[in-house]
Design a protein with these regions (language model features):
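Conserved acetyl-CoA-binding loop-helix of GNAT-fold acetyltransferases
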Residues: 89-104, 125-130
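GNAT-family acyltransferases
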Residues: 1-78, 83-86, 99-103, 107, ...
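Short acidic/polar active-site loop segments enriched in Thr and Asp
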Residues: 111
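Conserved beta-strand-loop-alpha-helix junction that forms the acyl-donor binding cleft
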Residues: 115-125
């Protein structure tokens, strides 16, 4: 399984892809390692966790994106993302997350995608705005967002 955009490959995190990312010096955090362990128990969760974002031109891992679990009973999933700082402000996050959102809606299992970001994370806020996500509410530190299937793009 692999998603593809004009500039990127987006691949689910597996033991093999973790090894490749680590060889490049990419810090695969506990969310990735935990996801791979979950996949060992239940292969159905593979697409509903972490994915690496790889630049086509040189096969460099730029960051990771993904969902925080399978869709719930209300067909809602939460998306998250993080990129190496030197790849910020180049459109990679927007391009990758848009592809993942499109994929999720095409599965038929998802009606709503939510996200949260720190109030002062202006780069992340801009990504969510470019994805046409709508602000739902906020706490003292976090802003909550969503996009519904019939409203994407």
């Amino acid at each position: 399984m692999k998603l593809e955009t004009e500039r990127l490959y987006i691949v689910p995190c597996t033991e093999e892809s973790i090894h490749v990312a680590n060889e490049q010096g990419y810090n695969s955090g506990p969310h990735i390692v935990g996801h791979v362990e979950n996949v060992k128990q239940n292969k159905d969760v593979l697409p509903w966790g972490a994915w690496y974002v790889i630049r086509k031109e040189d096969d460099i891992v730029l960051g990771d994106i993904g969902f925080k679990g399978k869709p719930n009973e209300e067909h809602i999933v939460e998306v998250g993302y993080g990129f190496i700082e030197k790849y910020w402000n180049k459109g990679y996050a927007t391009e990758a997350v848009q592809e993942l959102i499109d994929w999720a809606f095409q599965t038929g299992a998802v009606e709503t995608i939510i996200a949260e970001t720190l109030l002062n994370n202006y780069g992340s806020i801009r990504v969510l705005e470019k994805l046409h996500m709508k602000r739902v509410d906020a706490t003292e530190t976090m802003m909550n967002w969503k996009i519904e299937k019939n409203r994407s793009k």
